[in-house]
Amino acid sequence: MDTNLAYAMAKIMKIRNVGDYSRYVGHTDRHPLVSVIDYAEVSPVRHSLNNYSVYGIFFHDEAEIDLAYGCGKYDYKKGTVICVAPGQIGGKEDNGEQVMLTGWALLFHPDLLHATHLEKAIKNYSFFDYRVNEALHMTDEEHDIFVLLMRQIRDELQKRPDELQNAIIVGYIELMLNFCQRFYNRQFITRKLENSDILMKFDSLLRDYYEEKTQLTLGIPTVQYCADKLCMSPNYFGDMIKKTTGDTASNYIRQY
């Protein structure tokens, strides 16, 4: 194995279950499949670059963290939400530094969703496949809603387990995901100027593609191809085009 590759792999922490992350930050779980962490109670914490086998929703209130991702750098600031899904890698490599954080993290294992409506429905929340530089920036009101839901899930976890506990927790998680989708919809609307600029770059990309006759060798450009050229994830790019034009990115390409 390449030495640099082996070193990079050694720096990635595998989060196979919620307990792996909780133990790293010094949090004690009350449930094997779901964890709610108030960072104010465990700080200071070290950075970690994680390979997730669980779902995670993270937001911080104060800390500013530079994360390298994709085509540039991203400043993780107050009121920013990042969602991760199993199979994804995210975070910042441990460099020995300890940081004071205030904010919350919700992690839950896919097994928690087994035989529930959310088991299949979670695939509809495309923001789990957004890049970190496409994160949600919350308003103060949206932030308060997220904190309230985090506390409600935590309160439920502190109760004596019964046959309805998992269903109630999954219900809260689905409610949080729906609010997250609503907040993203608001963000797409409030970023009309930025989205218009991306749309112009999209048009320019398609124009150059056909003027250079690239379609003769590669065929019709795909959403993945266009998103990569614009340094965006396919899901965020597709959602942005849909919100901006009312049409899907694939239809927009075909009709160009």
Where are these regions (language model features)?
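Short helix->loop/beta-hairpin flanking segments within DNA-binding domains
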Residues: 204-219
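A hydrophobic/aromatic-rich effector-binding and dimerization subdomain
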Residues: 95-159
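Generic protein-terminus/edge-of-domain signal
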Residues: 1-68, 72-74
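Short acidic-glycine-tyrosine-enriched beta hairpin
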Residues: 71-85
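An amphipathic alpha-helical interaction segment
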Residues: 144-204
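Basic/polar phosphate-binding segments, predominantly the helix-turn-helix DNA-binding elements
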Residues: 208, 220-256
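Short beta-strand His + acidic residue motifs that chelate non-heme Fe in jelly-roll/DSBH
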Residues: 66-68, 90-98
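Histidine-centered metal-chelating micro-motifs
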Residues: 82, 87-93, 113-114
